């Protein structure tokens, strides 16, 4: 549940990037959690090849040094490379020492973009296709703010943040991800520490994490008690002060 699970989409070389390939595993997990987390290019990808490699099945344009291949074995390195660049950016540009893995995961999901119909999250693409620019330097003057140092140590604890939106029409996206303890093998659900994401707009409307309809957050739903990733995504956020609150709904573990 703490790992980044990657599905694969086609690339422009042999098809449409919005096409999720048949060989990409689908969710959900047994307890209903959303998987995969993101998509990355996995169709007809060129990669370095070991000189001793004998497997050329399903490939074309193979040589002693390179191999063209299709599968999540190609998509996962693409996502891993994006994750490595996010970590390097946090350390070298943002000067954030030892960023947590959950923060890197959150930024991957923050920048992910829906493919095909507007229907995230879903069990084909999770939160969408990795887009490194959206994760680190979004267009149109939008900013990214992160926190991976705050601690919630007991049920009922909470942490709030406020953000001022000055231009109407801006998109507002909040991502909460945390590294959860391992649950019992026999547990029907795998979430141990249940955190909830709540976003309140200037008019007092509250959006709960992962409460989505037609690819965008909606009001009036229920808090998520399965996933250790929660997202709120709102198009055309209204001008004013928005409040993001992280609530420790059930501190079931030792940390």
Question: Locations of the language-model features?
Answer:
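Catalytic-core segments of hydrolase enzymes
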Residues: 1-47, 109-112, 170-182
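Extracellular hydrolytic enzyme modules, especially secreted metalloproteases
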Residues: 4-12, 21, 101-132
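Hydrophobic alpha-helical scaffolding
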Residues: 9, 24, 28, 68-77, ...
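Hydrolase catalytic cores
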Residues: 42-119
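Noncatalytic accessory or regulatory domains flanking protease catalytic cores in secreted, cell-surface
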Residues: 67, 121, 198-255
